[in-house]
């Protein structure tokens, strides 16, 4: 992910100016990295080192989503809908 894409995601999901640490921003950035790595692993099936990193990122995103769900269910539902994480 290049710098411009990262800044765009931060601007889209931040709650206020300069907000980079809110769960919404972290979830959005992790989702972008997960999507990129997933496409990489479809081509390079034996790249187990990157696969482990993918699983760790998915776990981190899951824990952030669990936190957000327990703190504010509306923000949780909003981020799920924006990112299209649930069917």
Curated annotation (Swiss-Prot):
Disulfide bonds: none annotated. SUPFAM superfamilies: S15/NS1 RNA-binding domain (SSF47060). SMART domains: Ribosomal_S15. InterPro entries: Ribosomal_uS15 (IPR000589), Ribosomal_uS15_bac-type (IPR005290), uS15_NS1_RNA-bd_sf (IPR009068). GO terms for molecular function: rRNA binding; structural constituent of ribosome. GO terms for biological process: translation. One of its GO terms (cellular component) is cytosolic small ribosomal subunit. Pfam families: Ribosomal_S15. CDD domains: Ribosomal_S15p_S13e. Keywords: Ribonucleoprotein, Ribosomal protein, RNA-binding, rRNA-binding. Belongs to the universal ribosomal protein uS15 family. Part of the 30S ribosomal subunit. Forms a bridge to the 50S subunit in the 70S ribosome, contacting the 23S rRNA. PANTHER family: RIBOSOMAL PROTEIN S15, BACTERIAL AND ORGANELLAR, SMALL RIBOSOMAL SUBUNIT PROTEIN US15M. One of the primary rRNA binding proteins, it binds directly to 16S rRNA where it helps nucleate assembly of the platform of the 30S subunit by binding and bridging several RNA helices of the 16S rRNA. This is Small ribosomal subunit protein uS15. It comes from Clostridium acetobutylicum (strain ATCC 824 / DSM 792 / JCM 1419 / IAM 19013 / LMG 5710 / NBRC 13948 / NRRL B-527 / VKM B-1787 / 2291 / W).
